[in-house]
């Protein structure tokens, strides 16, 4: 069927050129990486150091959230509904931080990995092993029930 175009069809528009992005699937050691957000920290050394400190702080925060003295204090509040709402909000923050840490680990950057492990170790030492506060945090009753090692 002839549309009167003399057989001359317009060429298709050129495809947009996209910069190829590479995601590491093995650990690598370098500051040129992306952690959590596109182009962050990028190729800037100062931003990479900030990313390392941020991941360290997130890991310490996650260990603080596991601090059972805080949980026990929240459980002893007089208003059970308000305490339940507060405990739920704190739990939501804990889960969100844990997912952010997991996503950062998926960058496979060795420095990020070491910062997260060091943050967990520092947080454990400070809050769970008893360096801060009045000794090791006592376990809650539900922890004892769910512990597979406990008799």
Curated annotation (Swiss-Prot):
GO terms for molecular function: copper ion transmembrane transporter activity; sugar transmembrane transporter activity. Pfam families: Ctr. It is found in: Cell membrane. Self-interacts. Interacts with SWEET11 and COPT1. Involved in the transport of copper, in cooperation with SWEET11 and COPT1. Contributes to the removal of copper (Cu) from xylem, and thus to the sensitivity toward bacterial pathogens such as X.oryzae pv. oryzae (Xoo). Belongs to the copper transporter (Ctr) (TC 1.A.56) family. SLC31A subfamily. This is Copper transporter 2.
């Amino acid at each position: 069927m002839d549309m009167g175009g003399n057989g001359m069809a317009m060429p298709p528009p050129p495809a947009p050129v996209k910069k190829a992005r590479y995601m590491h699937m093995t650990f690598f050691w370098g500051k040129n990486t992306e952690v959590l957000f596109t182009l962050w920290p990028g190729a800037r050394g100062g931003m990479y150091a900030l990313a390392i400190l941020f991941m360290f702080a997130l890991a310490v925060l996650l260990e603080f959230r596991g601090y059972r003295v805080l949980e026990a204090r929240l459980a002893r509040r007089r208003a059970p509904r308000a305490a339940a709402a507060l405990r739920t909000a704190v739990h939501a923050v804990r889960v969100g931080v844990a997912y952010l840490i997991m996503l950062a680990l998926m960058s496979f950057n060795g420095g990020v990995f070491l910062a997260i492990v060091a943050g967990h170790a520092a947080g454990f030492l400070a809050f769970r092993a008893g360096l801060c506060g009045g000794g090791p945090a006592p376990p809650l009753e539900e922890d004892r029930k769910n512990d597979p090692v406990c008799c």
